[in-house]
């Protein structure tokens, strides 16, 4: 037994049901906290979230978290579902729809480290009279890996500052977002800022500076630096 297959009750126009699978080491490990859930916030799971039961596999790509769960199978092979075998896989930027071979790549399971800026928003206008700017956001990494550092920049990545992390800094079984914030002095004379963020997880994985080297035809695994452009208003 190498895989645990999960099949949902929903189906597409061909009649094929949605399915996915997890490696047995993920599905059955007590350190991965995989569950079959029937309640959400103390009440039965809502229909749109998978009533009556669904799989919850924290740290794993959402495509494996099967809703409306109807069948579980222990198997030597992964799910035969289209969405396991022929979707949600990453490829080189050189691969296009004419050359792609989905059998050549493994199905996405744990996701890469990522982060985002929530405040300020793209296009925001801040006053130079404030003399400082406060940034807020979140960071997260797949597989339960904790976030050990978040770096932020006000000049497009030329110089960096370490953000403050909120709450307990768990290095393993870290399933939730790690919130971060930073209050920084405004660069003198600047009339615009390009704010960037990148995170580092507990195995020292970090993020690429642009999408170019990780672009893929399916648009998955996109974890380049998040950038936000803001204006500085001077009286």
Predicted features along the sequence, with ranges:
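Extended, aromatic/histidine-rich regions of cofactor-dependent oxidoreductases associated
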Residues: 1-235
């Amino acid at each position: 037994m190498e895989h645990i297959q999960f099949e949902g009750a929903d189906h597409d126009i061909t009649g094929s049901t949605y399915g996915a699978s997890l490696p047995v080491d993920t599905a059955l490990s007590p350190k991965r906290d995989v569950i079959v859930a029937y309640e959400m916030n103390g009440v039965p799971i809502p229909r749109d979230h998978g009533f009556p039961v669904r799989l919850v596999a924290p740290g794993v790509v959402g495509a494996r978290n099967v809703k409306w769960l109807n069948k579980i199978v222990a198997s030597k092979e992964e799910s035969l579902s289209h969405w396991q075998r022929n979707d949600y896989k990453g490829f080189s930027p050189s691969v296009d729809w004419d050359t792609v071979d989905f059998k050549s790549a493994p199905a996405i399971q744990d996701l890469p480290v990522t982060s985002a800026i929530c405040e300020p928003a793209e296009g925001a206008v801040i006053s130079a009279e404030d003399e400082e700017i406060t940034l807020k956001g979140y960071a997260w990494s797949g597989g339960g890996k904790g976030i050990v550092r978040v770096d932020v920049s006000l000049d497009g990545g030329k110089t960096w500052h370490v953000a403050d992390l909120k709450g307990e800094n768990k290095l393993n079984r870290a399933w939730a977002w790690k919130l971060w914030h930073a209050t920084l002095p405004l660069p003198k004379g600047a009339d615009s800022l390009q704010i960037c963020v990148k995170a580092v997880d507990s195995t020292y994985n970090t993020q690429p500076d642009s999408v170019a080297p990780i672009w893929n035809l399916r648009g998955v695994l996109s974890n380049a630096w998040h950038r936000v452009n803001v204006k500085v208003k001077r009286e």
